[in-house]
């Protein structure tokens, strides 16, 4: 709903008049930056989901998309026992996913590390998994996860994926990009 005078949302105008509930105090929120541990420069997918069967469903999605892929999945529960659920077909990648999931510490998030597959090969299947809410990143770049923390828990605010732009591509850069995509088989030669 919009007010008629200055087109600001009516609820924003009225919010200043609402008295706080008895005993209410604003929760302090701290935002921290968590560097994703990725010593081999593997592809990592970080996202948010909402249900305990996520780890198993993501396993099936990746396995069905790229059968030769090696991967590890860690999913942080947000209620009940609040465990990190683990699936995958490579022990080292499962361990890496768990270490990063614990470091991020945000409920209902998942971390997937991939070997012998690119995110572009599995993202559609991951997105089509019914419990997946969003994907924050899918990259092999260095990643920092921005995590908001209050007394109850943590949530991902966003990610810093890679580095800042250093300029705008030239015609030579464009030619290199087009050749690279054909070289790795993602565009017809």
Residue ranges and their predicted role:
Residues 100-106, 117-189:
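Helix-rich interaction surfaces within compact, conserved domain-sized segments
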Residues 42-45, 69-74, 83, 108-111, ...:
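Structural motif
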């Amino acid at each position: 709903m919009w007010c008629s005078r200055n087109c600001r949302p009516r609820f924003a105008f009225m919010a200043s008049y609402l008295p706080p509930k008895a005993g209410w105090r604003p929760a302090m929120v701290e935002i921290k930056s968590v560097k994703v541990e990725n010593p081999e420069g593997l592809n990592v997918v970080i996202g948010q989901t909402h249900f305990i069967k996520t780890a198993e469903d993501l396993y099936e999605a990746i396995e069905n998309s790229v059968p030769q892929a090696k991967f590890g999945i860690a999913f942080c529960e947000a209620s009940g026992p609040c465990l990190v659920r683990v699936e995958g077909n490579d022990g080292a990648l499962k361990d890496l996913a768990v270490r990063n999931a614990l470091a991020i510490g945000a409920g209902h998030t998942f971390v997937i590390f991939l070997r012998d597959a690119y995110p572009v090969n599995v993202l559609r299947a991951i997105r089509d998994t019914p419990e997946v809410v969003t994907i924050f990143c899918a990259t092999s770049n260095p990643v920092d996860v921005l995590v908001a923390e209050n007394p109850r828990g943590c949530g991902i605010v966003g990610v810093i994926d890679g580095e800042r732009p250093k300029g705008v591509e030239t015609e030579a850069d464009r030619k290199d990009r087009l050749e690279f995509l054909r070289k790795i088989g993602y565009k017809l030669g």
